[in-house]
Amino acid sequence: LKVNTFAPFFLIKSALPYLTRSKGSVLNIGSVNAWSGEPNLLAYSISKGALMTMTRNLGDSLHRKNNVRVNQINPGWVLTEKEVERKKNHGLKHDWYKNLPNIYAPSGRILLPEEIASLATYWLSDESGPVSGQVIDLEQYPMIGRNISKDPLNLT
């Protein structure tokens, strides 16, 4: 909770005078685990759920009172260097992500960090308009009720 919930709250609180003067925008980085966490990620899922509630509340109150937008993106499974290494440590081949069954990734691949960054840039920009208090899921299948464990990944 300290990293995923308290830290964003205190960062926003500290930056609020500047954000108010600049009519700024905050983008919290959540996770689809906020909705239906994988079985082994209970504490993480709770913290991301709390962040989502905070985003919705601050997105309303700070937008009305300070003209500061607060939104959140909830990435799904992202192909980070850490994720590649983690799966290799679980005994998977170095290129495990190149042939994913559609139960894990309907498109045959998982999200790339660059795709998340592109969407984050949009939500922080003025081009995203007056939208505030929204949580946007970045996943390739409906999230509610479907978040199977990918640890360990069964590619057989």
Language model features: what each stretch is:
Residues I12, S47, T55:
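Active-site helix of classical SDR
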Residues R64-R69, V131-G133:
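Short, small/polar-rich loop/turn modules that mediate ligand/substrate recognition or access, typified
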Residues S31:
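Residue(s) in the substrate-gating loop at a strand-loop-helix junction
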Residues G37-S45, N57, R86:
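Active-site loop-to-helix junction immediately N-terminal to the catalytic Tyr of the SDR YXXXK motif
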Residues S36-L42, K65, G108:
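Active-site loop immediately N-terminal to the catalytic Tyr-X3-Lys motif
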Residues S36, T121, S132-T156:
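Short C-terminal tail/terminal secondary-structure segment
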Residues P17, D60-R64, G129:
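Alpha-helical segment proximal to the catalytic Tyr-Lys
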